[in-house]
């Protein structure tokens, strides 16, 4: 292996970086190939399983890490089931590690949603590629479109179109079509293509395009938000509608999702947008136009429209009807409402993610974390932990961390009000982090990189940590106190 490295390094074979690079190659070549997926899993369905299986089949990926929206999703709605349950289902169906997308980014536009997800993958420093679905199914075409979008999306180009009341996505598409032709512009007609373009843009902007290889799978069975479906694959939107209507959806999801939905229905814990009617109206009626103007995606006088609508609306449907305008998609308006509810400000989106919250993992997920922990830190490095208490402590020294913790806990506490049966607050400190043990699993990592993961509530994990540390300290003390074999022999001779 060292000879291979010397050949690769050429004249730089005696560079101070050589020990690290040699170590890195020895630990990774032929052992791990990690691909990331940025997702929502709302709920986890057969289309997601197809993506995971095809990613492994076509790329040779051995490990899958998911950056998953927490309790709220990018369409501006609460997730059907809480983040801990969705993460648990994911690791039982092919995902190895689930990390939470911070709420301020899960409720952001496509560009910022993608940027945060890519940043978190980059922060692990051991991710080899990113897998995403798209309607076009071609990384080459998506990359061409990403370059075009990056070039034409300037304030000077956008301003004339926006002043005509043209929505931002349509304005971007018009600019791309005008300069690069309709074939490139038409790529932006489809929602998954748009996200795919943003993933590639983010990789390029963050300087990760050479480290994290984009890989796309052509969507099968159903388009995003479509009611069309194959015999086994349907969109999340269609599945949620079936659940809401009380119809059979089992053909489109794994058993774990069927069981979880049944459990949540029985306990009346499914979360729906309509259940937030009163709390949203209450919050909006307590905000001034100036406060609303500080909310992400609010501009061009929209704060005044929201302010007036909240005072006369008698239902959530009425509120949305009074706010909506042609230039703003409904998903954007819904995101604004939840951002306002949680006090998320535009300035919050100028701060990169400050930590990575682990929601679920298995043995391979533990390998990903161990590998990440063995690599040198860089500009994207952030801490990862399953316990939010770790970040509360860090927040005492860093106001950005404390702010992020506050947004997370507040949004989770409000989420518990969104089901028919109201749950206690404190989900982020009581929710169970899943560790799914793989039967017969044997780690191929070197012995010094193996790790034993812990599962349970944050309190249980903290207790296990303390017990491990105590046992380790006791073992070390016993070792120091015990006489060596050589000394014992000398004493016996006396």
Model feature map: region roles:
Residues 32-86:
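N-terminal catalytic cores of NTP/NDP-binding nucleotidyl/phosphoryl-transfer enzymes
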């Amino acid at each position: 292996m060292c000879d291979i490295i010397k050949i690769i390094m050429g004249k730089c074979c005696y560079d101070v970086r050589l020990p690290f690079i040699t170590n890195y190659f020895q630990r990774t070549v032929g052992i791990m190939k990690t691909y990331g997926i940025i997702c929502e899993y709302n709920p986890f369905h057969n289309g997601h399983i197809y993506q995971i299986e095809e990613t492994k089949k076509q790329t040779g990926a051995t490990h899958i890490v998911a950056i998953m929206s927490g309790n709220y999703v990018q369409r501006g709605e609460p997730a059907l089931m809480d983040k801990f349950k969705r993460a648990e289902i994911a690791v039982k169906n092919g995902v190895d590690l689930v990390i939470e997308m911070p709420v301020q980014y899960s409720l952001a536009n496509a560009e910022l949603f993608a940027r945060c997800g890519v940043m978190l993958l980059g922060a692990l420093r051991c991710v080899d590629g990113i897998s995403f679905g798209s309607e076009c199914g071609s990384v080459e075409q998506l990359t061409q479109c990403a370059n075009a979008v990056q070039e034409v999306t300037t304030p000077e180009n956008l301003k004339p179109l926006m002043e005509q009341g043209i929505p931002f996505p349509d304005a971007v598409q018009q600019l791309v079509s005008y300069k690069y032709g309709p074939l490139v512009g038409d790529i932006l007609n489809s929602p998954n293509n748009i996200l795919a373009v943003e993933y590639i843009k983010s990789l390029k902007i963050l300087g990760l395009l050479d480290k994290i290889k984009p890989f796309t799978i052509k969507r099968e069975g159903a388009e995003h938000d479509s009611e069309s479906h194959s015999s086994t694959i349907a969109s999340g939107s269609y599945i949620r509608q079936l659940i809401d209507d009380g119809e059979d959806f089992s053909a489109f999801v794994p058993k774990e999702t069927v069981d979880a939905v049944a459990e949540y229905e029985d306990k009346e814990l499914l979360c729906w947008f309509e259940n937030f009617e009163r709390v949203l109206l209450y919050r909006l009626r307590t905000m001034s136009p100036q406060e609303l103007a500080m909310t992400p995606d609010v501009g061009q006088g929209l704060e005044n429209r929201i302010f007036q609508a909240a005072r006369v609306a008698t239902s959530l449907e009425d509120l949305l009807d009074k706010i909506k305008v042609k230039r703003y998609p409904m998903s954007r308006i819904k995101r604004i409402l939840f951002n306002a509810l949680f006090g998320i400000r535009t300035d919050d989106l100028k701060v990169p993610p400050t930590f990575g919250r682990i929601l679920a993992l298995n043995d391979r997920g533990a390998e990903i974390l161990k590998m990440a922990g063995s690599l040198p830190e860089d500009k994207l490095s952030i801490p990862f932990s399953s316990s939010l208490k770790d970040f509360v402590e860090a927040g005492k020294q860093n106001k950005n961390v404390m702010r992020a913790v506050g947004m997370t806990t507040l949004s989770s506490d409000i989420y518990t009000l969104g089901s028919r049966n109201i749950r206690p607050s404190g989900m982020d400190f009581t929710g169970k982090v899943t560790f799914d043990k793989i039967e017969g699993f044997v780690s191929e990592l070197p012995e010094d990189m193996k790790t034993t993961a812990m599962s349970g509530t944050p309190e249980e994990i903290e207790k296990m940590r303390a017990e491990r540390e105590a046992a380790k300290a006791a073992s070390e003390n016993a070792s120091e106190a015990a006489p060596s074999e050589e000394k014992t022999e000398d004493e016996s001779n006396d």
